Amino acid sequence: MRKPRSTLMKTAGMAFAAALGLLGSIVGPSAGVAEAAPTGIRVSDGRVVEANGNEFVMRGINHAYTWYPEQTTAMADIAAKGANTVRVVLGSGDRWTRTSASQVSGLIDQCKANKVICVLEVHDTTGYGEDGAATTLDKAADYWISVKSALEGQEDYVVVNIGNEPYGNTNASAWTGATKSAIGKLRNAGLDHALMVDAPNWGQDWSGTMRANAASVFASDPDRNTIFSIHMYGVYDTAAEVQDYLNHFVNNELPIVVGEFGDAHSDGNPDEDAIMATAQSLGVGYIGWSWSGNGSGVEYLDMVNGFDANSLTGWGNRFINGANGIVATSETASVYGDGGGDTGGGTAPNGYPYCVDGSASDPDGDGWGWESSRSCVVPGGSADTGGDTGGGTAPNGYPYCVDGSASDPDGDGWGWENSRSCVVAGSGADS
């Protein structure tokens, strides 16, 4: 799991990552051009959305199922705290006990019963290349194909996280080819779910490998339905590092989730406040590590003591009840039928999301607010209508520009708002 590194390695690695990130932003292809077929959870313009097009921002907790299968109430307990996602640790049988297809089906049923999205991950790949007991992404793909019967038809509820932290700090550059190959193998086998891929370097990508190659990995997926996951521990001990990494993905329309993080770690002191605040401001998902059951000196990462939902640790209380935490920011997936409505969540008739904080997000009283780095509609306000002027969708499928021609300095009918292209109503592009 979170492997310690030297300070020198961190400094050199982050400098290299910054250089690679700059190169990628110059020459990398735009990943937001192609979109997945409208089935299940998918990627659209660099955002994670549900089948109905509603954006879904993960606010979840990791659960170590494969080591604690007897903790049968954990899923319900996590959901009761307000999480909308549970990332579930599975075993492929290569290192840890294999999670069978029937067990996978049971876990998905639990997710659905508790109205959370299931991110299912194979943990046996952790630290491959540096940890001799770890297995390959190719073997992880074989596992997913072997439990295909449990996954089919569950695309609305399940994200397949191919392999946890699939490379350590040895030969991390091989991550790109191995990840592309695993994605292709799963697509060729008929798995059309949203896929999630973890970064190398024990998930922390201090080498910048995922950052530099994410666009090409995304483009290699014929479904264009791959979500990137960064794990933020000691490498991300300043707000600047957190913001730089997440902003790179958002600005390049590459879907990113913080798949693991904590408030402390043996390799440094992660800035959990910056992680949560930045994720909230960008509309990026996060999944904290972990509910309970940690050992080997990292017991401080438990959110509850001994799987007791009524015994929150300091980390658990901060993550669940603190600023930008689960209680304040989590919204249930709309596939469950109660994740929206018209009071603080859901989608307005003009296609824009409702403001979670209502009129508090609208200081000038025009009916439009600003949350998660995008415009939102105040329920019941003057903007809470349909039409094609200042919201809604143009005939070509792109949203209309809220600010009209003000968003179109070159006068070609196309504007740029909320990190995506928009159409100026009545312009030459409005067709």
Describe every region a protein language model picked out:
Residues 11-17, 34-52, 58, 172-184, ...:
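N-terminal presequences and immediately downstream first alpha-helices
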Residues 40-41, 68-72, 137-145, 149-159, ...:
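Extracellular glycoside hydrolase catalytic/binding regions
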Residues 310-341, 374-384, 422-428:
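A recurrent domain-boundary module in secreted/ectodomain proteins
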